[in-house]
Amino acid sequence: MRIVSSLDEQFRLLHGRSVALLGAVPADRLYWQPRPLTGLYPAHSCGEHILRSAAAVEQTFGGINSNLWDDPFEWTLPEQLPTPSHVENYLAEAEQTRARSFGLFRSDSDLLKEIAVPSGDPRPLLDLVLETLTRAAHHQGRAFATFRLFSEARLPGL
């Protein structure tokens, strides 16, 4: 189970970094926009990227757990999660959903099993898990970059 354990660790680290970053962001800067949301290339806030990272995890592992591939977009809007404590609760929910999936993996070979996804084409679990880790880390990186636009603070343990 070396691959499963390694992936589990990477997702736990991802979650820990998001929680640490959230703790470093002043509440009044959580949804601060680096520039107006006009044009083709919106610049999202630190909080929005933290949420998008967790939402990627929730959507994939919610799909694996219960075959519900709902996009968490509507319940991860800033209006729905207006404070850092609301966001932290959502991060914990997404992490619990992910951990539940990893608890079902009994061996590395489980990651080779295929699962039906919304597109209709079956995909190996390993592909979905790696794609999700990449997408979630991408949004987390963007959250860190946005944080750097308004803060010089050193993030603890990062």
Can you annotate each of these PLM segments?
Residues 1, 19, 109-111:
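A generic, residue-level signal for flexible/boundary positions that often mark functional hotspots
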Residues 1-8, 84-88:
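Active-site rim elements
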Residues 8, 12, 16-19, 29-76, ...:
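Short, contiguous alpha-helical
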Residues 18-21, 94:
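Amphipathic alpha-helical packing segments from all-alpha helical-bundle domains
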Residues 22-26:
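Long, well-ordered alpha-helical segments
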Residues 78-117, 123-140:
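Acidic/histidine-rich alpha-helical segments that form the ligand environment
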